[in-house]
Every structure is written in structure tokens, then in C-alpha cells.
Amino acid sequence: IQEKYPRSKKKSPKKEIHKTVFLLSYQGKYLIRKRPNRGLLASLYEFYNVDEHFNLSEAKNYLEENDFSVCAIHKDKKGKHVFTHLLWKMSGFRVELKDYPRNCGFLLATKEELERLYSIPSAFKTYLDEILN
């Protein structure tokens, strides 16, 4: 009987992307940016992130090389998010900044604004929950 039914194809493995998520804060507010209008999670807001995995010292160096003045940096939770075709494996860092980087394309948002005004994708839920709780 099984020969009469089509066999389902085996799913190809999801592409894994390793990300580092930075929870950047300045004077009690968090830096977020709007994602592009096209593509994955279009037009939603996100925490600063890069498609690389960093340890603590690499993360600090990366931020300083990209003109962020780091006051303090601490390792945060790891997270993952499964899309239909992708798997994001994320490691996070909480970063307190000495100065707000002007003309950087980021908005400053309070905890309340993050919860009520800005659409943060569920992919970043692990990190949003860390801020809100």
C-alpha cells in the first residue's frame, strides 16, 4: 500500500547563523534600530546585532572599533530562534555606554517604550524579557 502514496522529501537542514546581540544602554535607555523595509523581519525594531560570535573581549573590541564608548560590558543569556529556513543561535551582551553615539541610526527607548511603542520581533524575546524583568 505504501508504494501508492508519494514519499515526502526529507527536510534539508536549516541554515545556522551565529549572532551576537548587544543590549546597548545609555542613561537608563536602550538603543534600538529599525530593520530594513524588505527581507526577514522587515520594518520591525531590533537590538544591535552582528552575524558573528564573540567572546567578552572580542565583543568589547568590536564595539570600540565601531565608535561605541563602552563603560561596562557583561555577558548575557544565549538565545535561539527558529525560522522556517534559518536557525539563529545568539549570544548576548549587556553594554553600558559612556556616550550616546550621535548620527548612528539608533533610537533611545525606555523599558516602557520598548514594551508599548516599538515592535520587537519574537526572535529577540529572550533579550527583551531580560530588560523588562
Question: What do the PLM-derived regions correspond to, one by one?
Answer:
Residues 1-133:
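Intrinsically disordered, low-complexity, charged terminal extensions of DNA damage-control enzymes
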